[in-house]
Structures are given as C-alpha cells and as structure tokens.
Amino acid sequence: MELPAVNLKVILLVHWLLTTWGCLVFSSSYAWGNFTILALGVWAVAQRDSIDAIGMFLGGLVATIFLDIIYISIFYSSVATGDTGRFGAGMAILSLLLKPFSCCLVYHMHRERGGELPLRPDFFGPSQEHSAYQTIDSSSDAAADPFASLENKGQAVPRGY
C-alpha cells in the first residue's frame, strides 16, 4: 500500500493546531514536550536534505506518543470537567491518535532523504550526513604511521619528550 504524498508542513500545521488546543487544559510539560518536537519539525522543513533533522523529528514524535499517553492518563480526570476541559482533552487525544500515522509519513520522508532504520548498534555514532569533504591522504598507510617515510629517507624522526 502506497502512503499518500503529504507535505511535512501540513503535518506540522495539524499537530501545532491540535497541540495549541490541547494546551487549553494541559499545560507545562505537555506544552514543552510537544512544542519542542514541533520546533524540530520546523528544522526538518528548513533543511530539506538533512537526515538528522527529519530523524530527530521522527524520534521526537515517537517519544511524545508515550509521553502524551502518560500525561493524558494522569491528568484527564482533573481537567475534563467543563466544556473547555473536554474540548482541550479531546484535541490532545486526537493529536495522540494522529501521531502514529504521522510517524509513518515522516518515516517515509526519512527514507526518501536517505535515512536508514535507526535501530542499529552504531545509531549514536557519527552522523549520516554526506558532504563533499575529502581527506588529503589518499592511502590509509600514511594515516597509520606518518613518520614511516622519514625513516626510509634517512631523516631524523622527531621525538616527543
């Protein structure tokens, strides 16, 4: 099944709107968590070729799914008393229900940008960003022993004291 072509800006707009309405009743950590992840989404929009930006946005969306479940389950009974409380809680729940679908769409965008599945042992290692930078050394032997050529030419090898 082919995923629909959805712009990242639409995903951000929908989640921003639902988070704003959810903040009518859920404030503090709910707002900080969700708006921080939306800021990562803005970064992913601004840098269209960045694998790190879209990857961090995807990871943040997954994290906020769990955080929203915990936050809504703890505070729902105390805030959903009036009409405004029920509306805000409903929008937060709707945002939570849309996040797995958004994660699928963002993961598809992550793959289009050249990203890989982030479940591998060296995930926290060097970045996957590709640049035009090339090293000066063409051989790996020169990097392993930089003074090997000096000994072969009869020159004195510098010593560290």
Swiss-Prot record:
The modification Phosphothreonine is found at T135. It is found in: Endoplasmic reticulum membrane; Golgi apparatus membrane; Cytoplasmic vesicle membrane. One of its GO terms (molecular function) is angiotensin type II receptor activity. One of its GO terms (biological process) is regulation of blood pressure. The keyword DNA-binding does not apply. Residues 110-122 are annotated as: Interaction with AGTR1. The modification Phosphoserine is found at S127, S138. Pfam families: AGTRAP. It comes from the Eukaryota. Keywords: Cytoplasmic vesicle, Endoplasmic reticulum, Golgi apparatus, Membrane, Phosphoprotein, Transmembrane, Transmembrane helix. InterPro entries: AGTRAP. Residues 1-26, 75-86 are extracellular. Ubiquitous but more abundant in kidney, testis and heart. Interacts with RACK1, and with the C-terminal region of AGTR1. PANTHER family: TYPE-1 ANGIOTENSIN II RECEPTOR-ASSOCIATED PROTEIN. This is Type-1 angiotensin II receptor-associated protein. It comes from Mus musculus.
